[in-house]
């Protein structure tokens, strides 16, 4: 896969593409795509017996403050093949800090072109409380048994904040090209 050829999205930051690294409900393995080769590597085995609460990946051509492309959790129930690209709408952000510093997670849903199931979801507050709690619980605890690693939740932000994070990440990536 040539990541350089994958567009950011149809109308960033409102409509973006996400390259999936870890499918929803998969075994506790953290995969990470090598951004130069496009190859998927095993980053680590997650020590807690937890599964990702959504399909997890990143937006191409972005750069977060942690020097990686911006992370995205796609809220849907169907596991996607690692390496595939899905078009999504950002609906919020989970603001976190971990052993590596600031670590925001964009929360998104598939675009209406892919499925009508999320047509009524406009902001993270439209998700059920149970879904939000699962997402928080996962990201708060998935590093618990890894020596020297930790994660702390700072809070939720709305879709406008998420879009601003994405726009900043796009500009940051352009600045280093």
Curated annotation (Swiss-Prot):
Listed binding positions for Mg(2+) 2 are 71
Q: Which UniProt keywords apply?
A: Cytoplasm, Hydrolase, Magnesium, Metal-binding
Please give an example of a GO cellular component term from this record. cytoplasm
The record's listing under Pfam families reads:
Pyrophosphatase
Q: What class of enzyme is it?
A: hydrolase
Query: Magnesium as a keyword?
Result: yes
| Chief localization | cytoplasm
* A molecular function GO annotation: inorganic diphosphate phosphatase activity
Q: Tell me the domain of life.
A: Bacteria
Give residues annotated as binding substrate.
Answer: 30, 44, 56, 142
EC nos: 3.6.1.1
User: Mind telling me which InterPro entries this protein's record contains?
Assistant: Pyrophosphatase, Pyrophosphatase_sf
Per the record, the GO terms for biological process are: phosphate-containing compound metabolic process
Cofactors (names): Mg(2+)
Q: Which reaction does it catalyse?
A: diphosphate + H2O = 2 phosphate + H(+)
Record bears the keyword Metal-binding: yes
Quote the SUPFAM superfamilies the UniProt record gives.
Inorganic pyrophosphatase
Where it sits in the cell: the answer is: Cytoplasm
Listed binding positions for Mg(2+) 1 are 66, 71, 103
Q: PANTHER family this protein is in?
A: INORGANIC PYROPHOSPHATASE
**What function does the entry list?**
Catalyzes the hydrolysis of inorganic pyrophosphate (PPi) forming two phosphate ions.
Query: Subunit composition?
Result: Homohexamer.
Return the protein name.
Inorganic pyrophosphatase
* Organism of provenance: Bartonella bacilliformis (strain ATCC 35685 / KC583 / Herrer 020/F12,63)
